[in-house]
Amino acid sequence: MMTTARPIILHHFEKSPFSEKVRVVFGLKNIEWTSVLISRIMPRPDLMPLTGGGYRRTPVMQIGADIYCDTQCIIRELERRFPEPTLFPNGYQGIGWSTAMWTDRSFFQNTVNLVFGSLAGQVPQDFIADREKLRGAKFDVPAMTAAIPQMRDQFRAHLQWVEIQLGDGRAWMSGDTASLCDVNAYMNVWYVRAHLPNADEVLAEFGNTRAWENRMRSVGHGRSSEISTSAALDIAASATPQTAILADTNDPNGRKPGDRVEVTLTPMSPEQREAHLAEYRKGFTINPCH
């Protein structure tokens, strides 16, 4: 197992579904990490200097002065640093990564609509305003509430895919060992369980999925301690970035380290941030322009 001399710091909040994905990876790999709890809405004054000011999504991983935004980027770095036990026990990395296109988009959007439509008047106005800025569109809770019957149908269809995959008695989505496929799919079940009082009723017919959910929960979140946001900022200020400067020589658009780029959070957010391209290698790392 590879280790790091600098603490792995996760900036997150407890009910963040994408943070839960990373926390479960910590559990699967038995990683020691440091927790920094942040507000679930903007502003986040001690985190914003690390991310360039405008990044709204959660979580953010920090290792010294290296900042990792986007869950797939975070998980990729954790797999690189801690290759055993692997998140790809059968070697199918493409399948592991690509399942996120299902679980993080259509499945998750359905889950969000079901959860907030069910919570209705309990959703705070400041949260609604924050999510409207993130999405660039109305966060229409009454419309979500009106669509609950359709959302239940769609959520049931997504869960049926999980149920079928587990239907031959396997313990995990890919077989005998937990993988990134499990982490990806579990996020939506966890989110419903964390928010809906009637989660038992929603999940009742899916026996294989409920047993798998219990196994996923038992994975835990690794070994964690907690520090303040200001302490994490001090750690970054006293360190220097360690990310290697690499380039993708096959990039058809000719981008290279040092280029100025605009970064848009897809698929929901219209917001753009100007940055310097620090690394470009089957994905990229950016340094914000201040």
PLM feature spans:
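GST-like domain detector, emphasizing the conserved glutathione-binding G-site
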Residues: 1-131, 270-290
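A short, terminal or domain-edge coil/loop segment
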Residues: 36, 87-98, 140-147, 224-238
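Hydrophobic beta-strand core residues of beta-sandwich domains
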Residues: 87-88, 172-174, 255
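GST-like fold's C-terminal all-alpha helical module
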Residues: 103-218
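Short gly/pro-enriched beta-turn/loop segments at secondary-structure junctions
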Residues: 178-180, 228, 255-258
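Catalytic cores of secreted or luminal carbohydrate-active enzymes
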Residues: 201-253
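Sequence termini and other peripheral, non-core segments
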Residues: 227, 231, 237, 267, ...
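Short coil-to-beta transition motif at edge beta-strands of beta-rich domains
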Residues: 252-271, 275
